[in-house]
UniProtKB/Swiss-Prot annotation:
Keywords: Ribonucleoprotein, Ribosomal protein. The keyword Ribosomal protein applies. This is Small ribosomal subunit protein bS21. It holds the Pfam family Ribosomal_S21. The gene is rpsU. It comes from Rickettsia felis (strain ATCC VR-1525 / URRWXCal2). GO terms for cellular component: ribonucleoprotein complex; ribosome. It comes from the Bacteria.
Length: 66
């Protein structure tokens, strides 16, 4: 559960903080993934692609750090 404090009736900042916390906890991604049923084979493929993307990103970052 996500809790956000409202200070002095400032709804704009509260809404902004709420959206930021939702994004930080990957809430929107989970909602999007659960919208339709994903077969186990498609899930494995997607997770493998995400892992490969992370590895490429890490390799690129490591290459520029050296």
């Amino acid at each position: 559960m996500i809790l956000v404090n409202v200070h002095a009736g400032n709804c704009d900042n509260t809404l902004k903080n709420f959206k930021k916390r939702l994004q930080r906890e990957l809430y929107f991604r989970k909602m999007k993934e659960q919208r339709y049923y994903e077969t186990p084979s498609a899930k494995r493929v997607r997770k493998a692609q995400e892992a490969a993307r992370r590895q490429r990103k890490f390799a690129r970052k490591k290459m520029f750090d050296e």
